[in-house]
């Protein structure tokens, strides 16, 4: 009988013959129905069908044969006897239809108790040898397996397992044989088809695992050796990978645990191209799942379950050692994932044993050296990145309610830190990698260590009292050695640069070009995320050393211990060269914290142990020593960065001076202020920068209190004022001098308990205040530009009003006569501005030209008698304390600097249009004076 020429026609034939078969069965015409069935089964003889199409036909035929089997069972033995039919169907002409009919009739007969089950089963499986075509034979044996699934003898598991084993062995042979049929050019196609058929073979192992259930002795003595022998003997890549994976998946975890050595030894005899790491990883996953289930059922399972006491790691370690010895050809791409899978197992079974990890990393280290560092490909680099950063290790925070009591490694953060502290081989492997790879790994390590999520979870748990006694999710650094090892890991980032370094060694490099490139690098100040992260790391290290609890005991780091750690950090980060401008401020900040802590200890000792002079002297000397360390850090920044960080160095000196003053160390404070003035004199050249620096120095000096002794304060404020009077631009001189007037008029600092009207020892000298204001007024009056002169005079007037409000005339020497005279002088200058424009309307037009339209226009008019200027609308142009012009946007609250335009357009139209600024400023001041008359009678004699 011929078969259809296409799958579609074959399906049509099968459906037609199925309908005819069902009709004959309904009419009890069994022989005719068997004839239709035989014709239908002929379609399974088609050699041109792909596995996918063959499966489609098989499914339809299976349903049809199920109907036939149901009829046979229901009509036995009334209309026929199945034993006779079993003999009858063996006369079918073609072997494929014959065997399908035999299996259908035979399995139908097996449903009855009188049937000789074992003989029929043996006969059917033996007859299946008649089909040696791989695809036909596989589906035929799969059909036998499906039909006999529930019909095997219940009282003889040995026979059942042997039956399935025989079927599996033959199916595997057919499956492997498929690879060697056809021309070589179709090899990839056949491999793809084989993978489509692999589930048929794997189903036999699934069925086998169901039959043996928990019978370990049968599995160990009969099943596993036979299966592994077949796997090894077939020498087929696809078969070996798939079957070992199925073995690991379908049989019980306890079986794998007890036969672990046998399974691992089998992988040593596989085809060299087999991906061993995939098989081992599957096995590891099963073993880890077993541990997870045991710990979930019983947190104390490590002491009660004998399986968990087995040396599982030792078995894997011996296996890796033998594998590395017998397979020196194994590439890094194959070896590293294999080691990584064992690391995963070790982390699950032995979370506290870092010696195991050190062994594994030593093995990888040796393999890397044997392989040759120059031979490491980009793919291998990625594998090292995954290995060293533990991306595949699934390290997650262990819940405090399910964690074993002997496991302090509660998070990936804890694990990484302990790894760095205890595994020297890990650091050695990292050191062998390229600089770029080292940076990536260290970057990820720092991200893990500084992850806030774990600590936030710990905070929440501690509030709800979820943590058991002695358990903490916080990471605590216990000694200086741990810090040293952590910093040694971070060295690639510490010494890294934002851009490529100049190639000084190149013979083609121009010396001048190298010099200027280095100069540009030093002068640049670009935000570097890596260095910013390192600065965060410094704070993280110091915070972790100051925590009070670890998982084992309570520990309070002494001040000296923290100081040693901070000095260790400094000695490591000094290697960064120009990068210290990013990291040293964090170190200095932590020095400041330790200084305050030292002062708190001193105050405690003075209160509790005032007679212990030795201890008090020790902490006093320690405090002074820390200021020396800070001074050294600041000098290191200057030496490494030259003039590119003068602003930072100036501010650090001033902050140290303020802190020393707060700690009543007036000599140290004076030294830091002197150093700040030295930086100002030697390193600052830009006029605006000098003005800003002087303002910052004046602000810092004004807050000091301990410098009053020994005339330190007088010396410094006079020096500050003199520098202000020597600035390049007169407007800067004027502003600097009138701002320095505050240095002779101290104000309250509420944080130290001072209060105006109660504290009577404020440093105040009204005569010097008046001298500063008079000097600044003379400078303002000498400026040739009337607009700037008027603006500065208005600013000086505001300062005079400040002193007039906050002090008596006898103290400040700012008299009403002086204020009235200053107001008259301002009015006179404003008249000059009006005369320059010929009319006040021109000022209004100038404001309109600045695109300040509509409701923001300033409508100005001039009073010819007193020179005052009145405006009825608010302007949206203002001037800063340093002379910066700012145009305000009243709609969205934003502002735009126009200082640069003004600075480059002297005498231009735009500068001419800004004349309304001093006018408006003076108007606001006059309005303030008028408003103060209601609350202060002294303002009534000030004429505006």
UniProtKB/Swiss-Prot annotation:
Pfam family of the protein (one): Vps35
Q: To which species is this protein native?
A: Saccharomyces cerevisiae (strain ATCC 204508 / S288c) (Baker's yeast)
- Relate the protein's function as given in its record: Plays a role in vesicular protein sorting. Required for the endosome-to-Golgi retrieval of the vacuolar protein sorting receptor VPS10. Vacuolar carboxypeptidase Y (CPY) sorting is completely dependent on the presence of functional VPS35. The latter may play a role in the function, modification or packaging of a CPY-specific receptor complex. Component of the membrane-associated retromer complex which is essential in endosome-to-Golgi retrograde transport. The VPS29-VPS26-VPS35 subcomplex may be involved in cargo selection.
| InterPro entries reported for this sequence | Vps35, Vps35_C
Q: How does it assemble?
A: Component of the retromer complex which consists of VPS29, VPS26, VPS35, VPS5 and VPS17. Component of a retromer subcomplex consisting of VPS29, VPS26 and VPS35.
**Residues where Phosphoserine is found:** 846, 848, 868
What gene codes for this chain? VPS35
Q: Which GO terms describe its biological process?
A: endocytic recycling; intracellular protein transport; negative regulation of endoplasmic reticulum unfolded protein response; protein retention in Golgi apparatus; retrograde transport, endosome to Golgi
A cellular component term from Gene Ontology for this protein is:
late endosome
Membrane topology according to the record: Peripheral membrane protein
Q: Which UniProt keywords apply?
A: Membrane, Phosphoprotein, Protein transport, Transport
Q: What else is known?
A: Present with 2360 molecules/cell in log phase SD medium.
Q: Where would you find the membrane-spanning parts of this chain?
A: none
**Full protein name:** Vacuolar protein sorting-associated protein 35
Q: Which family does it belong to?
A: Belongs to the VPS35 family.
Q: Where in the cell is it found?
A: Membrane
